[in-house]
Amino acid sequence: MKRKSIPILLLTGYLGAGKTTLLNHILKNQEGYKVAIIVNDIGEINVDQKLIDKNAQIQKEDTDVVGLTNGCICCTLKLDLLQQLSALASSNKFDYIIIEASGICEPIPIAQTITYANETLYSRGLPELFHLDNIICVADAARLSNEFTCGKHLLEPCEDEDSLDSLLMQQLEFCNTVILNKAETVNENEKNEIKAVIHKLCKDAGIIEASFGQVNLEELLNTHNFDSVSYTHLTLPTIR
């Protein structure tokens, strides 16, 4: 019997945007999915994992939470990420994997790592174990309005690649869906300005307004939004 490739949702967004809130919403409403979750935290203590573990207890048989700490899955923990993905996919216990990236993670290297793994398996005549289904960036509407002039500041040239501006821009540029969280905190004009900026950064991204991460799961899971062919221009990473 041919093993089915497990779809992956990659969840990105800066600290405080609402990634963990959204993830806990998914856990409470997973509607029959058997979900495995990988939570990345750059510190020694994975705070987000502890918050998620509480809700995971509700679905003990259908949920597993794995923490990756002391580094970023976009750089120092690439190999650890692949090992965990392979183990979860090979266990035959889950039909969906969600990765919550650290707030300072860049999404492109993570997507490259997963794509690289599939390319390697294909070159060896082996079936893929997992694949990217959707990349979601959770954005804080209030913060974009108050600190980034409704996002317009992100369109200005940025010389510091490690700055918050550059990171937010990368997260918004490289995603399939933007969850505009805390949407109730800004007025309609501000929302429209923010959406216009998002579409300038990523013209094909879908935008979903949300409060407290409340989104229909059908808009998040098994969307087939990520098309690896569209990203073949990306340089594949060296995994060490």
Question: Which ranges hold each PLM region?
Answer:
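Nucleotide-state-sensitive switch-loop elements of NTP-binding domains
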Residues: 3-9, 17, 21-165
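Residues at the beta-strand->loop junction immediately N-terminal to the Walker
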Residues: 12
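A short, hydrophobic C-terminal helix/tail in secreted or cell-surface proteins
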Residues: 235-240
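Short boundary motifs at domain starts and secondary-structure transition points
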Residues: 1-2, 169
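C-terminal accessory "lid"/substrate-recognition subdomains
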Residues: 157-234
